[in-house]
Amino acid sequence: MAKLLLFLLPAILGLLVPRSAVALGTNYLLSGQTLDTEGHLKNGDFDLVMQDDCNLVLYNGNWQSNTANNGRDCKLTLTDYGELVIKNGDGSTVWKSGAQSVKGNYAAVVHPDGRLVVLGPSVFKIDPWVRGLNSLRFRNIPFTNNLLFSGQVLYGDGRLTAKNHQLVMQGDCNLVLYGGKYGWQSNTHGNGEHCFLRLNHKGELIIKDDDFKTIWSSRSSSKQGEYVLILQDDGFGVIYGPAIFETSSKRSIAAS
């Protein structure tokens, strides 16, 4: 099980991730992807549904787009500017989140606290499909979840998992991505004791040891905000942020 703790240490890279054809994640939607009618994004008890009545509903998160019966065969997409858009089957626009930023790669995520959050653009990417210094072979490790948010920590063999890919903060102080063709690692084996990985509120991944000495950093730095590291189903580990749109509790919505 991934060990996630909330830390109070604040502290990103301007890198845009090239578009690749990837499968829709279970709890995230990337720029250019579509959530079809009756499609779901889930995180624990929270379920985002693009309903057949054209209403986008976050069950147990007390939010909806209020577009019931405004169209048929509706679909939700996330643009390259971080805007969520619901379109009717005829292509007309039914609803927009209204939040836009610079062109890039964004992610809409069902947050574990019950919010729908759009973060981006991407600021850092771990690539296990390219041969290089950080390559290593795949080995079998048990699975857990795929998201690390700002302020959260992985330590003591804590891991993120997605399909056949696993990002592990190993007890030997090495951060390792198992999967892809070549895998990836931070090359910090044996460089510290009781090391942990933290994503800060400026989008930077940092490995620190028990004395809080920095062992490794993604060297990505952007403005203060909320970020997320997603271990995607295609094997890429990508940091998106800051948040440019998020839902808040409105009224309770009963499941139909």
Swiss-Prot record:
Its main location: secreted. This is Mannose-specific lectin 1. Disulfide bonds join 54-74, 173-195. A motif (Carbohydrate-binding motif 2) lies at residues 170-178. InterPro entries: Bulb-type_lectin_dom, Bulb-type_lectin_dom_sf. Forms heterodimers. It comes from Remusatia vivipara. Coiled coil: none annotated. Beta-D-mannose binds at residues 51-55, 59, 63-64, 170-174, 178, 182-185.
